[in-house]
């Protein structure tokens, strides 16, 4: 609870002192990380608790919950719990950007075990999703060694021989097709 109250104070202070309400900044997305990368904000519910508190402090839904499929998949909440939270977050007008990223590997989107398609669809169906981004990590990047050491499976080579430019382009095409298909089907 103290981490939430400290973050609320900090973000409210920045919001007020920088006069963000009167700036061109329309929203501020908050992302949670998996346990080990963060200690407190490690699932969608905890992230939303923070965002709700910050928005209450400033009086309107400026802060948004960033939905990252990889972090949702790596958290202690199952798919259904994440779906239910996405629906509630959207109803409160606090749904932010969607990160299409594969749990654990952070590699080729096809290694997501269903998390990307399911959560992206749920976000789209709320009618509140404005942006979706593709996020892929280079599995052998030395800067990511601490993450590889943190979790089994992180940094596994899921490239199938492709370079990262091609993986990213494939990911963007995949997400564009998914979004187009959801639109065609009326969502």
Range-by-range predicted roles:
Residues 9-13, 17, 41-187:
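Histidine-acidic metal/acid-base catalytic patches
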Residues 1-34:
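Glycine/proline-rich, flexible active-site/cofactor-binding loop segments
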């Amino acid at each position: 609870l103290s981490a939430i109250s400290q973050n609320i104070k900090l973000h409210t202070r920045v919001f007020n002192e920088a006069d963000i309400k009167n700036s061109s900044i329309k929203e501020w997305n908050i992302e949670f990380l998996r346990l080990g990368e963060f200690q407190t904000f490690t699932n969608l519910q905890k992230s939303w608790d923070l965002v709700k508190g910050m928005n209450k402090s400033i009086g309107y839904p400026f802060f948004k919950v960033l939905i990252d499929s990889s972090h949702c998949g790596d958290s202690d909440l199952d798919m259904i719990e994440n779906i239910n939270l996405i629906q509630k977050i959207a109803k409160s007008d606090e749904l932010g950007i969607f990160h299409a990223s594969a749990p654990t590997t952070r590699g080729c989107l096809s290694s997501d075990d269903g998390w990307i398609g399911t959560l992206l669809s749920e976000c789209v169906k709320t009618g509140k999703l404005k942006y979706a981004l593709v996020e892929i990590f280079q599995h052998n990047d030395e800067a990511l060694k601490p993450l590889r050491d943190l979790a089994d499976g992180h940094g596994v080579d899921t490239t199938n021989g492709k370079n990262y430019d091609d993986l990213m382009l494939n990911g963007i095409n995949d997400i564009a097709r998914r979004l187009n298909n959801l639109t065609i089907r009326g969502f």
